[in-house]
Amino acid sequence: MLPKIEDYDQLLREFRWRIPETFNIGVAVSDAWAARDPDRVCLQHFSPDGAHAALTYGAFAARSSAFAGGLAAHGVSPGDRVAILLPKGFEAAIAHAAIYKMGAVALPLALLFGVEALAYRLKDAGAAAIITNRFGYERLVASRDELPELRLVVLAEGGDEPGTVPFRALANGVSRFEAAVTKPDDPALMIYTSGTTGPPKGALHGHRVLLGHLPGFQLHHHFLPQSGDRMWTPADWAWAGGLLNALLPSLFFGVPVVSSLAQKFDAHMAFRIMEEMDIRNAFIPPTALRLLKSVERPRQRYALKLRTLGSAGEALGRETFEWAKRELGIEVSEFYGQTECNIVISSATGLGVVKPGSMGKAAPGHQVAIIDGQGRVLPAGAVGQVAVRRPDPVMFLGYWGNEQATKAKFIGDWMTTGDQGVMDEEGYFTFFGRDDDVITSSGYRIGPGEIEDCLAGHPHVQLAAAVGKPDPIRTEIVKAFVVLKPGVAAGEETAAGIREWVKNRLSMHEYPREIAFVDSLPMTTSGKVIRRLLRQKAAAEARPSHG
């Protein structure tokens, strides 16, 4: 836990890691609280009809222990990969805690995955078991024959299918279970990378990953836990963002976590959840925050009680930061990390560590720098790759079954991120773009984030992405893919207005010379734009046609 020091520089100097010899995530987020406050509410589930449900730490600990015993009785052993293909809710949280308690490895997967994406991850991980619902089961059936290592299917709802075990039969069993004694480096969790730049890789984490998240988490939520704190995120718990930026750290600190049914993001529903469930702390990725802007005068329509608001996953940008400050009455604490090494940079609005358009400063306990291709630390103001120095408790153990990729991730003791950035004289880091996303035009290196932020501020634009399109004269030109707000007509007049908007706010070399109006943008399950697909589309357009 962070010492409650209200000065960032002093906090940075005085912070020390205290990693115990043994640590188990499942015990820390359930049994530890159940022993001292069993009636304390740990999970709440929002229902649109008002029939909200709640679960106490006592019940959470008992059910997850029973579930762990049930998995063990069905042949699941320590070290086995156990997939969780469930929506946010009590069952998913119980499954996570149970898997950690028994020393197995949790493999969270998104219900948005198609048949091939699901099969790829299950096969690559060699998953021994999967816990899913009827929707996930139907996806699984199509590829079951390709998964010889998958021995157990636990079904969380619906009738009993041949070869499956009902979730309730395991969770309602005998609750006495001797949790595995695990060390911080023992494998606990495997999350597949987003696949924004290539085939997804399984990032394997030890139990220490939760401890590694705590300083940055407390920093951007201003010394959480405070009285009345309650957490919600629209992010899927199958993503590092939803799981490690919201669910697990909150449960560790005794802060109730609110879940809601998986659905297409709806701004009004998001505000309703925050109002009805008395949400005080939220993690809302930048794309979702931009979609919230469609609701005019939100504080007049909804009684919000937000104390802290964190955002990460993509660059937030000045426009969205200023909107939240003006319309929500709160400064967003932007932070940064990736699946392999999360929350290593963070803003702390409560400590005055905030600069619109910046991701923040290095979080206590983490060494972060901008380096060149040889691993040399670059001076302030120089653009290079964001890198994190090992050892670090939040850093992954390695890529599953891919030692070559793990080695390639490091230059000496610096873990490279593949993200271009810059650090200023005050120590603030600004995201420039993925290595592959940086646009080279007329000799300029242009980060797409600033252009997208500017586009998002246009009154007619709902979402936008900028990529480089090959050009024989300029190397590349900026091409923007734009989703317009409802009711706005697509056409050259609208495109010209958007071009002028960017030209007047940024610079002549950064405005999009081409604009394509689209109904939607390709997204990962974690809400990141897959610019690679848009680049491929732009490159195909640039190639001369034959015949």
Residue ranges and their predicted role:
Residues D39-A97, G114-A119, P166-R168:
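Conserved AMP-binding/adenylate-forming core of the ANL superfamily
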Residues F113, Y120, I130-N133, A282, ...:
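AMP-binding/adenylate-forming catalytic core of the ANL superfamily
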Residues A53-G58, A188-P215:
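Conserved AMP-binding A3 loop
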Residues A73-H74, A97, K101-A169, T182, ...:
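Structural core segment of the AMP-binding/adenylate-forming
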Residues P38-V41, V154, G159, N172-S194, ...:
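Conserved pre-ATP/AMP-binding loop-to-beta segment of ANL
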Residues A362-G365, R376-A408, I446:
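Conserved ATP/PPi-binding loop(s) of AMP-dependent carboxylate-activating enzymes
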Residues L211-T233, A238-R280, L291-V295:
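Conserved AMP-binding/adenylation subdomain of ANL enzymes
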Residues F252, I279-F283, K293-V354, Q367:
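Gly/Ser/Thr-rich phosphate-binding loop
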